[in-house]
């Protein structure tokens, strides 16, 4: 068989279709539904991964992207076609790689639902989501894009609501549904503005707008920018449109949470990339300033709110907001460089954002899989009820630790590389003659450094409170390692974190066609893709780093204590005893740090933002000097939820109650409403 994208992509889609069909066929046979639905998904994702890798590797020598027509149509303006250009192949790789790891993981994870939930339904909707997401990043027509975008959103809603018997799950599902459709409405209006300018819905036609002076000078372009920023920004989870994300991700099944955080929100990043750098043309300065400001605010607030969480999956959800902000910082810097006539530096900043996109997909998927393994073993998301899991789940602890190091941007793993590239792109603003760049880029760089430091602190908390010390509940004490396929899915992403961290030059080398497509420049003039990353920016000033060299040095340094042990070990005696307990009779779990206590200094420093509320309940025996129990609770305010969304919700409900009078139950009245609406639309069209 010829292993080309034209052959492998249809095989991937067939795999997802068969996986969906198997889930529905074996609704009453949960073991068969699990095996075949997620088994076919694994095979389909593997074919998709290979197809996208081959497409990226060959795009440098291919003059035209692969185009396939999925279905014939006679509907005007509608084409069911896909185009696998370098941008689609890059995001297709993200979708397929995560889908492969998650499908493997799901083979073991879904066993936890046996006897409780219908695994066939889970597998069917999971495959639909994979297929729709793959088509979203490859669609070549706005109508087709919106169709598969909506299928993706609805299947994700069904999966978020999978455990719908829980009130918090139903509430999160409705919130996601509403926010998703508001975003879809904004995207639809943006496409209508592009249709008005081109007379068609094909992406190739939208691309021609960048060469039309009348479009570049029109107000419609700015309106389209704002609509797309809002629509795709909701899906990506940017502040202040993020409110659905920390609600939906924790309640979804963990394989779905990993896909939503690792992939689904990246479809918003795909949309922003396609629109900003492919459709709308050279940006005005305020576009870049807006995107950079939103990215910076999202990064800082995301990590601050993450530090306040003791729900492990909710903590990871807020970190998704943080990392989306880091991606947008790269995009904002790129737009500003394009406006000031620095296409090479714009390419560097864009690559920083795109590389962080795939890095975040990999390490955040890994972390959610680790959190799912912990939930599978302990049946709780509350870190206060965990502890001591590294001894009981050593493989899961190791995988989670790799993800924690990667997301903390520590060398030599992948998170360090993309954040280093982001720092380098922001530092180039110092050499610019534009005063706005010299003002904003240092501020952005400083806040990015703050974000990285807080992220590292947060994952010291997450790993330490979850996996170290003594168990703080019976569930944690009785935890066990998860099935092999769950570990295998995590292992795939561990390998990806290591590869993207140690060998970034191998991957960056194949992205030249992608940057050529979006900015007209290649990476080669900026980065010497040899034994390390060597940046040669303004006046040849820049930084040099080699993550592979760091890794080799780290391994070499390990041999020093080993050599000392070999030399001196014969002369010393080893004694094994209990952990030092500060002179007390014995350590108990009540003496350990809690997640709430660990983050208290940050809560106090930023109390103007968090507005913490503390509740202390004491019970006494016979005197106020002899307390029998003390209960302490701390709550922080999510400022956007309490100050914006809840008042807005009350306003909408109040208006809805007043408009109920229109629902008279009369067919004649409804026909009059339709007639009046039709007249208004005709008048608008004149």
PLM segments and residue spans:
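Interfacial loop-to-helix junctions that mark the boundaries of transmembrane helices
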Residues: 2-7, 81-88, 141-143, 211-218, ...
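Hydrophobic transmembrane alpha-helices and their helix-loop junctions in integral membrane proteins
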Residues: 101-145, 157-481
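Hydrophobic alpha-helical transmembrane segments
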Residues: 81-96, 216-232, 436-452, 530-559
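Aromatic-capped, Gly/Pro-kinked transmembrane alpha-helices
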Residues: 506-556, 564-686
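Hydrophobic alpha-helical membrane-insertion segments
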Residues: 39-56, 181-192, 400-412, 489-513
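Transmembrane helix-loop-helix hairpins at membrane boundaries of multipass inner-membrane proteins
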Residues: 1-10, 21-124, 197-215, 575-577
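Alpha-helical transmembrane segments
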Residues: 20-24, 104, 303, 462, ...
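Membrane-interfacial helical/loop segments at transmembrane boundaries in membrane proteins
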Residues: 62-76, 202-213, 421-434, 506-541
